[in-house]
């Protein structure tokens, strides 16, 4: 192994998160040697017991290379992704993982909305929107799974926990949060779907969407849910 590869490998395993991400990008550009180090890193760290940004970034970086041998290896070794798709109600989160792994954020957003309604029950699935009282009863495990998938596959840019952090930083004022995450500009709400940004150039917390036109109570119930303290978000 060359000195440069050795140094980057050490940086990947031992450095700060920021330096890890720099090392991942560099290793991905260094052909089989660098990519082999990334694959080994995945093998040692998956399945994740808790979300780790560097592991998500390695997986997504390798997928984004779109190299047949690597893609085949990832599909064989991680058929359901890198994070346990756990649900307290037996809900299948594999379609969400697949959409996020493919960086198809618009489809992932639609799936998330469907899964949240499924979590709330038949009434919500039929009407296709949520009551805040239904959100309060969501199992923490399911919200943790959904949020972890968004966070891991977006390099930490997307997820309800990201929105919540920005909401807290805004003094819990939704009028300050909406423009910060790109859901409103001045007095004008962002139009769905074309007004939203369905890639990683979007503002932090831009996705997944909530129907804020129905008011803030669903969002507030979600951001106040015990899942965030329970799982250390």
Swiss-Prot record:
Signal peptide: none annotated. Disulfide bonds: none annotated. It holds the Pfam family GUN4_N. This is Ycf53-like protein. SUPFAM superfamilies: ARM repeat, GUN4-like. The lineage of its organism: Bacteria, Bacillati, Cyanobacteriota, Cyanophyceae, Synechococcales. It comes from Synechocystis sp. (strain ATCC 27184 / PCC 6803 / Kazusa). Belongs to the ycf53 family. GO terms for molecular function: tetrapyrrole binding.
């Amino acid at each position: 192994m060359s000195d440069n590869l050795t140094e980057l490998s050490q940086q990947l395993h031992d450095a700060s998160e920021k330096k890890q991400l720099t090392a991942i990008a560099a290793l991905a550009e260094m052909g089989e040697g660098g990519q082999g180090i990334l694959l080994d890193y995945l093998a040692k760290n998956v399945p994740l017991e808790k979300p780790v940004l560097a592991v998500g970034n390695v997986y997504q970086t390798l997928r984004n290379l779109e190299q047949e041998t690597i893609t085949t290896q990832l599909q064989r070794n991680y058929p359901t992704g890198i994070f346990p798709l756990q649900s307290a109600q037996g809900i299948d989160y594999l379609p969400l993982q697949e959409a996020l792994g493919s960086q198809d954020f618009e489809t992932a957003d639609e799936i998330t909305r469907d899964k949240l309604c499924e979590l709330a029950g038949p009434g919500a699935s039929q009407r296709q929107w949520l009551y805040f009282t239904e959100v309060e009863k969501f199992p923490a495990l399911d919200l943790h799974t959904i949020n972890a998938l968004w966070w891991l596959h977006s390099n930490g840019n997307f997820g309800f926990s990201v929105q919540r952090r920005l909401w807290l930083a805004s003094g819990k004022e939704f009028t300050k949060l909406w423009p910060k995450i790109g859901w409103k500009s001045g007095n004008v709400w962002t139009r769905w779907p074309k007004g939203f940004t369905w890639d990683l150039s979007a503002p932090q917390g831009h996705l997944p969407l909530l129907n804020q036109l129905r008011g803030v109570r669903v969002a507030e119930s979600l951001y106040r849910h015990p899942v965030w303290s329970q799982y250390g978000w």
